[in-house]
């Protein structure tokens, strides 16, 4: 008695279809599907820069060759 059976859901669905009409429900479903698709594409675009940043990250255990172009004296480094 506490939970709704399949018959309750079918009656609710029938009433909703009668109130809104099938064309309006179809439009709402299409809009909802487009919104979900746009959300998924946005999530993929948001994850792309993070993946690129991980690829550009320097290796932690490897040596990195660098070349200094100009030496600047630090404060307290007098000769």
Swiss-Prot record:
MF annotations from Gene Ontology: protein transmembrane transporter activity
Pfam entry (one): TatA_B_E
TM region positions: 1-21
Composition bias, Basic and acidic residues: 66-79
BP-aspect Gene Ontology terms: protein transport by the Tat complex
Disordered, as annotated region: 46-79
Cited PANTHER family: SEC-INDEPENDENT PROTEIN TRANSLOCASE PROTEIN TATA
Name of the molecule in the record: Sec-independent protein translocase protein TatA
Organism expressing this protein natively: Paraburkholderia phytofirmans (strain DSM 17436 / LMG 22146 / PsJN)
